[in-house]
A protein has these predicted regions:
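Signature of multi-pass transmembrane helix bundles
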Residues: 1-38, 44, 53, 59, ...
Length: 194
């Protein structure tokens, strides 16, 4: 036990440095913000696997309406939450990193968290989603593969979030924005600056 404590005390400066890294903090905060969605979708996954558990452990089967309707609904909820968790984490990580970057920005300059959140989600879609065409019922249809929008695309989510926020910070620090005439209302001009 003493050797473990000595090891931890010896590594304390390193652990402190790692814990203060704004990118790791953004990943942590991004996941924490997405956690309610992740947990609630896990509940639906548990409900959808209930018929198999009941048949195996209990020795009886649930009614057909449960096996079909309830399971299909629960799988749909799970797929549309965990299936797009990569997009959500891209946005929440970008928002968290924006907060950290804003604390380090010069006075009077700030990055709009909503803008970086939406831009990171779009960047993640560009990085992770592949578009192709397929024949469905004899017609050529444009489709895209959603495999990388979920947990498989988390690395793309982080790249999209970090790149987006850093590009925004670079532009705002150097005042690279779209400037409109003074006659344009402030709310509209601010949207172009962001």
């Amino acid at each position: 036990m003493e050797s473990i404590v000595k090891f931890l005390e010896k590594g304390q400066p390193y652990f402190d440095k790692v814990s203060k890294n704004i990118y790791l903090q953004a990943i942590k905060d991004g996941f924490l913000a997405a956690m309610p969605i992740i947990l609630s979708s896990s509940v639906f996954l548990l409900i959808s696997t209930l018929p198999g558990v009941v048949a195996t452990v209990g020795g009886f089967t649930l009614p057909d309406w449960w096996n079909v309707d309830v399971v299909n609904f629960c799988n749909k909820v799970y797929n549309f939450t965990m299936g797009v968790v990569g997009i959500m984490v891209a946005g929440t990580t970008a928002s968290a990193l924006t907060g950290s970057k804003n604390r380090r920005m010069p006075a009077g300059k700030a990055i709009n968290a909503t803008s970086t959140m939406v831009a990171a989600m779009c960047a993640m879609l560009i990085l992770a989603v592949t578009q192709t065409s397929a024949k469905i019922e004899g017609a050529d249809v444009s489709v895209f593969f959603t495999d990388n929008m979920g947990t498989k695309g988390l690395l793309s989510s982080f790249v999209a979030a970090f790149a987006t926020v850093n590009i925004y910070a670079f532009c705002i620090k150097r005042d690279i924005t779209i400037k409109l005439p003074k006659e344009v209302p402030g709310a509209i001009a601010q949207n172009f600056r962001d």
